Amino acid sequence: MKEQSPAPELWSTIDALSEWLDTNRPVEGREGLLLRILKLTEEVGEVSEAVIGATGQNPRKGVTHTWEDVQAELCDVVITALVALRTLTPEAREVFGGHLERVRERSVGSK
């Protein structure tokens, strides 16, 4: 598989999704913010469901998902996390980039 960097429009898409959600948010203020962050839990649960389905761990249901389903659900987790970060700060791109660099330095950068 060819390695790809994030699409150039990643952050503009995250901004657009955040704005769209803000426009259509049924709950405002702190509660709305908390609900947006809690959405991550729902998405992670969907990853778990897909893994269980891909491995056939539920004998009553058998194999119900594919590993491509797991990939899609993981992408949903990433998107939801970035939208939540963008909701917390308009500098989400810089915050994420700085944090990613710190993680890189303390792991692969320390070799």
Question: What residue ranges belong to the model's regions?
Answer:
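Flexible "arm" and connector segments at domain edges
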Residues: 1-111
